[in-house]
A protein has these predicted regions:
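Mixed-charge (Asp/Glu-Lys/Arg
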Residues: 5-7, 14-86, 92-222
Length: 222
């Protein structure tokens, strides 16, 4: 089987095709997936770290702090999931207004990368999963509890991640979210690459909108 044959997948607007489209017989477009999967260099090899032995943990801590601040601003809590067994790192919870009401919750998979700088003038930027299972947990059909991907992009220079001024603490750079439920990728693709909309900047207003949609049983994409 050729590479082209093995890399056919169903088209979805958030799948990063990096490809040319091939149409046949009036059916769904067939696409050629380019450059997805395989073994790459370690993702921290290019980082100017304070301590290379801890930088991955520090990237996680940076994103957790960002999201905890966003959740607090939206009147929510962020509860970390201690065991990564089902592709979820955190729960974002809006408490009920009264004891008789229900809380609203979404699950979140947190990813932090230094390898891309989103351009707000462009519609998307790309993110590649390091394992197929991380994608599958987000793409599978779920019942009530929905799950989103939250990707943080930050500087490869660790000492530039934050800067304090008298007006506040600046965090570089930001988090973006994507709702991937229902996506389909060929089983042969081991490290799917997805498109993250640059309009989906994660802040308190975005989190509130996501939780409102979840509360109404709507698609989180609106």
């Amino acid at each position: 089987m050729t590479l082209e044959e093995r890399c056919h997948l169903l088209v979805h607007p958030l799948i990063d095709l990096s490809c040319r489209s091939l149409y046949s017989g009036g059916g769904l477009p067939v696409v050629e997936l380019v450059g997805t999967g395989g073994i790459g260099r370690p993702r921290t090899s290019h980082i100017e770290a304070v301590d290379p032995l801890t930088v991955t943990d520090m990237m996680e801590q940076l994103q957790q702090g960002y999201m905890a601040s966003v959740a607090a601003t939206a009147g929510c809590t962020m509860e970390l999931v201690s065991k990564d067994k089902w592709g979820v790192d955190a729960q974002l919870i809006r408490p009920p207004r009264t004891a008789l009401d229900e809380e609203t919750m979404v699950l979140a998979q947190l990813k932090c990368t230094t390898q891309t700088v989103p351009d707000p003038a462009k519609e998307f930027f790309s993110y590649q999963f390091t394992k197929r299972q991380y994608f599958d947990h987000l793409a599978k059909r779920r019942g009530y509890l929905k799950a989103i991907l939250i990707v943080m992009t930050t500087s490869p220079r660790q000492r530039e991640w934050t800067e304090a001024t008298h007006s506040g603490l600046v965090t570089r750079r930001g988090c973006y979210w994507a709702y991937l439920e229902g996506m389909e990728v060929n089983p042969d693709v081991k490290k799917p690459t997805v498109r993250i909309p640059t309009k989906n900047l994660m802040d308190a207003a975005a989190l509130t909108t996501i939780l409102d949609r979840a509360d109404r049983g709507e698609s989180l994409n609106g």
